[in-house]
Structure formats: C-alpha cells, structure tokens
Amino acid sequence: MSSFNLSVDVNQNGNIKNVDSLSTLDDIDDIDFAKLLEKPRPLNIDRLRSLDERSLTELTGSPQLRNADNASRAPDHADYVISPSFGRRSGFNTPRSQPGFESHPMVGEAWDALRRSMVYFRGQPVGTIAAVDNSEEKLNYDQVFVRDFVPSALAFLMNGEPDIVKNFLLKTLRLQSWEKKIDRFQLGEGVMPASFKVFHDPVRNHETLIADFGESAIGRVAPVDSGFWWIILLRAYTKSTGDSSLADMPECQKGIRLILSLCLSEGFDTFPTLLCADGCCMIDRRMGVYGYPIEIQALFFMALRCALLLLKHDGEGKEMVEQIVKRLHALSYHMRSYFWLDLKQLNDIYRYKTEEYSHTAVNKFNVIPDSLPEWVFDFMPPHGGFFIGNVSPARMDFRWFALGNCIAILSSLATPEQSTAIMDLIESRWEELVGEMPLKVCYPAIESHEWRIVTGCDPKNTRWSYHNGGSWPVLLWLLTAACIKTGRPQIARRAIEVAEARLHKDHWPEYYDGKVGRYVGKQSRKNQTWSVAGYLVAKMMLEDPSHVGMVCLEEDKQMKPVMRRSNSWTC
C-alpha cells in the first residue's frame, strides 16, 4: 500500500466537515471567449508550439525535453487557454456565464444534482457516485466509478475546483497498489480499480475505501479502460491547473509506468492493438466487442500520448518513453490503415480477394467479402467515414461506436481528413445516431438470432436498448469536444438543444431506448451522475472552447502513414 495519505477529519454523516484547499489559486482576469463560437472553424491561434504539437521524433532527441514539458503546462497554445473561471473558488455556487452566453435554466439544476452526488472520505471530496436514485436497488450505483467520474472531474476543473479531482487521482492511485485477487488468481500490479466506495464503521468512527477490480463486475472482467482514463484525467488536471507537481510525484510516475507496462509488454501479438475480453470498458456486458475494440484502442492511443507529456525522461521514465514512441507509430499506422472505413474503402473490401499469402497480401486479415452486413452499404454516406468497431483475423465488426470515434478525434488518432469525415457521417446520419436523444453508443442494434448468439440472450441488451443501440446522454460531452476540435460547434449546439428538451424533465436518465432514443431506458437509473456531468461539460465547452484543451491533443505529423497497395489488388 502506498505510503502517502490525505490527513483530514473523519466524516460521520456523509456531509463535509472541513475541506481545506490543497493548492492556492491565483486570480486571473475574465476573458470573453464567446466570439470563438461565431464562426464554425477550428481553434487555431498562432502561439509558441506546445509539447502537444511536437513530433515523437523530437521528443526522444531533445535534451531540453523536461523543460519543454513543464513549459507546455503553461498557457502557451490554443489547446490550453486558462479558463476564466479558474482562480475563482465557486464553493457551492453555480458558475456564472460569460457575457453573451445565455445559460439554460437547467444548468443550475444540473449543478445541484452534481453536488448531491459528491462522495467524501475523511472530510475530503474524492469523487461522485454513479447515480442518486433511491427508487431502485443500489447494486453498485452507489460507488465511484473511474470512467463515470471523468466528466464530473472535467466539470469541476472547468469551474475552478480542482481539489476533488486531485483527491480522486491520489485515492485511486493508492488503490492501485493494493493486492488484487479474483478467486486464486492475482491481477497485474498496474490494474486500476473499476470503482470504489467509502465504508463507514460507526463503532470505530472510521472510514475505509473498498475497491472493485472486476471481482464483483458482470462477468468478472477487469476494467482495461480505467488505467487509461486515469492517465487522461491526470493530464487534464495538469493542463487545467498548470500544476505539474502532482504528475511529478514519484507515486504518480510509478502509477503511469505500471499501467502502461501491462500494455507494452512483449508477447505473442502480431498487432500493436490491445487484445481484450468482452465487458472490459464502458460496454461492460457481452456485446461482441472481444478482440480489438475501437474504444480500447482509441483510449490506449490517447493514454500513450498523455503519458509522453507526463513522464519524466530520466531512468525508468526514459526507457518507457522510447517504448511509447515506437508503439504510437505502429498503432497509428495500424488503426488508420485497417480500422478506417469510408465509401472507397468499403468498395475495396467488397472486391477483396481471399486466401492471400505472403507479405504482398492486401486482404491481410482474410476477411470474406460476403460477410459484409447489408446495412453498412446504405449507412455509409458519399462523404463521411468512421473507425469500425473491431478488426481481427477473418473478422471485421462494422458497427459504429461513438466513444471510440470521438476519442480518435480528440487524441488525433484520426487524421484531420478522417476527423472531418466522422463529423460528416454524424451530420449525414443524424436521425440514426442522434435522433431524439444524443448519442447512440453503437449502431446498429443486433437482434433476433444474432442477438442470441452474440449477447447470450442478455435481457438488458435487447435491440435498441442499453449498450445494444441505446442512446447515452453522457456521450454529449465527447461529441461536443470533437465538434469544437473539428470546427463544427453548430453540430454540438444542435445536439445539446435536442438533449435539453428532455433530460431534465426525464430526471437525467442513464440511457434511452428505441431506434431514435425516444423512450427512457427500461432499466435506466434516474439522476445518473455522468448524464448530468456530460451535459454540464458540453455546455461549458461551448461557452468557452478553450476548455477543450484539457482533453485534446494536436496531430503529430510524424505519425501520418504512407498508404501503399500491392499488385495483388483487384482492379
């Protein structure tokens, strides 16, 4: 167990007794960013290049790298402009809007709901519970989930309240060092918990944390995404506050290395992607995403790029940086080459030869053209494209997965052209992907015989419900960030207006059912925290686009692959 701790008073009744600021914030004058939204264009302010813009080649060769790293945490680029709210402790007040920005009445209600979800450990806020729904059995919805807390954390950072995020990062890091066993098998040292809860012993008047590393999850699957989200959030905290001291702590440096050591170890893999089991990410039940799911690959890519900015380049850190650089080059080429689908690529796959041998093969995964689903030919617009769900030997999952594609844009796994194509697809297929509630977690739903085979007759993942084509409001923040990065804020504004028509009235459901997301999910929890936080983050990003810098990385020009095709191509 880690030796560092946060010493505070014990909280006996769930209400905060004493919250001391963990850092001093300097007052910064208000800046009006409303004009940034007047024209749908990419944020592109010429400033000194930040570390995010530097190529991977430069990263490994520069002796001044650590100084550049620290400099990148200062406000020197459009992907990080200090938020007007940063430096103002809002306490428990709803943040005021920037001049010219009309706040929707439900913003205040959303902040109240987010405050009610806060969890305290020994007097300090350490996260937000998954849902505040007393009408249903709690199950594990009263826990703090790593992936669920990310939009909450971003909301607090954007509102100038970094303490809860810092506490969360430290507490989950401490949990990482715990011994992790499922039955008689010990998990890897770097595995981060899926969730944790605070247990209060009234006899001893003492609080402890109880973590779940997958031993209590559906299917008993370890959360592959938790570690990646932790690294991404650490970088967001560093960018937002300009404080690198947390990331520079030996414990945090070790935590990053342990997480990535699980992913960068050598084995039998012939691909740079990560092999995963079903249920290892947001889609936490059997849904046919085993293999190399786009969500994990995109998060892996973004976590690697964030780690490159956070790791110290000396000793163990330098060796890992070299591994990261090599993996990023291979991963970006693989994903952009084999996961990308547009009209031309779809037509090419339709005409694939099969049973090709040797290094000249074009159909490297031996995908049978007859296995292409009929729906994808109608779904693909003339101008548009997306990263498909999965690619493995003799198998391509052509489903659209929102989270993976949005993260691909934010991390610059997608090239600028691919990012534009993804946004074109969303606009062209608005009714299918947004409908009456943004955003479809995947499209289309699987049904009938395929549903029985793929899900094992899962009653929660029936067609157009939950993860099987359900609509998830939390994805609104990812869509908004992607829209702003690609210079298409009008798409986000339209999606937010759609959500505002129902979210508050329906009491912030976890997800919606139906082909267009018309119905509150049959097992959906009300007052779902990340639905609340996702809306708030989306609104604040539109209000101040500079906030996107917390979760946005610029393209590295060195990673753009040269596409070549061999003579075995069918003409």
Swiss-Prot record:
Q: Per UniProt, what is the name of the gene that codes for the protein in this document?
A: INVB
Q: What is its EC number?
A: 3.2.1.26
BP term (GO), one: carbohydrate metabolic process
Q: Which organism is it from?
A: Arabidopsis thaliana
Question: What is the organism lineage in this UniProt record?
Answer: Eukaryota, Viridiplantae, Streptophyta, Embryophyta, Tracheophyta
What is this protein's name? Probable alkaline/neutral invertase B
EC class: hydrolase
Look up the domain of life of the source: Eukaryota
Question: Where are the membrane-spanning stretches?
Answer: none
| Positions of post-translational Phosphoserine modification | S21, S55, S83, S85, S568
Checking InterPro entries in the record gives:
6-hairpin_glycosidase_sf, 6hp_glycosidase-like_sf, Glyco_hydro_100
